[in-house]
Amino acid sequence: VNPIDKIISIANEKNILTLVDAAQSISHIPIDVKKLKCDFFVFSGHKIMGPTGVGILYGRSEILNNMEPFLGGGHMINDVNMDSFTYNSIPFKFEAGTPNIAQAIGLSEAINFYNQFNFDQMHNYLDSLYKYLIEILISIPNIKLYSNNINNGPVISFTIENLHAYDVAKLLDTYNICLRAGHHCAQPILNKYNLESINRVSLYYYNTFEEIDLLKKSLLKIIKILS
């Protein structure tokens, strides 16, 4: 987890605009954009148990007021005549056309659901779960972990020697285990380490220690099948 508050502070001293991509941290770290003093803050709805195809873009009002919309359409205008037009107020001037109504409502409900959790309790549980996951993965032959630092949050990537990540993910699916395989939107870093693809396990509050045991059992079977 990057020290984003320190990074923003340095950027602010040099009058550099900052945008925080919180897609991977929004459901694990309590965030106050006003305390961070970031200019923009974004995350995807499905990263916080919401619908796909919707997300949040926060921007400081003084910046948004001075920005020009990149897209025209209904609802983003205040007045139109034959010679000119005026924009609506923020945030509406950036929301041209019919909005993604159902997904926006779903995201709002997901955030309300998330806010019911006791964050400290959730953090402690995920911390224990993550430590157990690392312990289990290390015990499996021919697995290589890509950073097992506890400060990473409950997400870890790995490869299995001589096995393709997509094959591993496909077979895990037959055991009702879902994880990611591929570049994870980070192809340059994979290229740097000469990796074609990797598997990624992401834990959340609804996961259990028993499911991690099932992951180990399934991976051992897959290694035996594909070796």
Regions found by a protein language model. Give the residues of each.
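Pyridoxal 5′-phosphate
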Residues: 1-227
